[in-house]
Every structure is written in C-alpha cells, then in structure tokens.
Amino acid sequence: MLPFIIIGGVLVIAIGGGALLFRASKQTTATPPKANSSPATALAGAKPAHAKGSENAPVVIEEFGDFQCPPCGAFYPQLKKLEADYGPDKLRVVFREFPLPTIHKHALIAADAAEAAGFQGHFWEMYDKLYSDQATWSKAPDPRTFFIDYARDIGLDLQRFVQDAGSPEADSRIMLDRQRGISLGVVGTPSIFVNGRMLPPETSEKQLRDMMDEAIKNGGK
C-alpha cells in the first residue's frame, strides 16, 4: 500500500567571512477543512507550481507533502520509479508544500529550504536531497547546517539561499499550497491526487499503476 497517514530560532552561518541569518519560519497548523470542501472549490496554490513533466501529459500526480514526514519519505522512491517507468511525456508531477510542524518540528524550515532553492531554479534538486537524506537531517537538533551543505552541493548562491529561506515570499508560497490542500480536504501527508482525484490510503502501487494506465489509454480522462 502507499505509505499514507491521516492526522488531524535563529541560526547564524559564517560564509566567506560574513555572517548570514537563516531565519526560522513561524509555526502554523492546518485548519480542518469544511465539510463541503471539494475539488470544485479548490484554491489555486502557489504560482508557478513546482512541476515537472509535460503540461500535456495524460497523468498528473499532485503530492501534498511534508519533507520530514516518514511516509512521504517512503513514497519518494515509489514516485521516482513511476517517473522513470512512464517518462515526462506521460507523467507530470506537481509538489505542494504541506508541512505539519505540530508533529514534525523541522518541517517548516525544510519547506523554506526547498522554496529558497526554487527561487534559484533548483527546487527539484533540493527536493531530492531532503527526501533522500531525510533519515539524517530529520534527527538533527538543528538541521539548517545540512540544508546549507545541500545548497552548496547543488551549486546555489549561498548568500541568496539563506536570505530567501524563511522570507515572506517563501512563507507565502508555503501558505498558498497549504490553503489549496485544505480546500481539497487534505489533512495528512502524503496526500496524493491523480488527475484531480485523491487516492484513498489503502491504494496499492498496482492499483495506482492501473489507474495511470487507464488514464493514458483514455487520453488523460
């Protein structure tokens, strides 16, 4: 089965002889969705969305994820395999920020790091780093030094990265994605939508592939 769950500081870093402030985000909690929430009333989320794959792909997987969420980390290699097997012409992947800081204390600063990388055009590289190395940084008392290392490995402008992490622009994107998720009825992570349809927690990988194959056969319907 897909790994679903359903649930209701300051760091100064010396770079090149200077001190940069990696700001921590304010903690927020998800507002429970209204009973009549539905895709028909869904909010748009952050624009542009973090997306890869053809805009004309017959299958769109939209993930609402939390980088510190263990089931999200478990879903990550499954999604990478789907990407490899189907390719960008058939599968488009969209990631939406849905940090749950009340249970994952580093979730917001991880989302900030991803958004800061995105401002330099490298969101997906940071996404890969955060999920593939989740078991390491998520256990650290303060993981921001790990995020700086990831940014350096990716080749980001470090001064800009630390300035953007936790900035109002990054926080706005995170909040817009969370609001979209709430409007769709998302209450936990990962929540996965295929062509606008939320998958139930008991969905198996085979069922997901069957659904994707059917959508491809029917031209995305």
Where do the model's predicted regions map?
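Structural alpha/beta surface segment adjacent to cysteine/selenocysteine redox centers
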Residues: 57, 62-152, 184, 213-220
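Short clusters of hydrophobic/aromatic residues that line enzyme substrate/ligand-binding pockets
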Residues: 51-52, 137, 199
